[in-house]
Amino acid sequence: MKKITITLLLILFVSSLSAQVGQARILEVKDGHMDKFMSGVAKKTQMYNNSEDSEKFYTFQILTGPNATDFIRVRWMESMNELDNPVDADELSYWNKNARPYYTEGAARIWSRNANLSHVPEESGNTNLRRVIYYNYKDSGEQDFWRFRQRVKKAMVESGYGSAMNVLGCAS
């Protein structure tokens, strides 16, 4: 069976640097409901996820590949234990009323951050731009893949590359 690994290039993405685990799910927006969905997500994010102490939820639109035009919703956490923490009831109610009716859920995964292969420069800032690259490899190519990731990090460090790159592996 193929192993799925993700390299998440988070360009200048500081707000989740300490996050070690991401719970991600694909959201397939229903035909004709894109504007309502995007409006509901934007308002919910402004209301409930705009402070340092709020849950870390991020919603990204997928631009290319087989899931183009779908969205991925990610909840960043320090550890898997946080999955046991309930989401704020008002926040969940708002989501269920203003976003949930407009999509169906696709695949869901848990990702763990590989700190040894991630590159986060001290001088990086925060931005809304993200690039996610999924790599699929056969079991026989696992060592080659991780050697490649080590070399990418080394090159970034040696060149003084100023953007962040977080490497995650699929944990579920």
Region locations from a protein language model:
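Sec-dependent N-terminal signal peptides
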Residues: 3-16
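Short S/T/G/P-rich N-terminal loop/turn motif that feeds into the first structured element of a domain
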Residues: 19-172
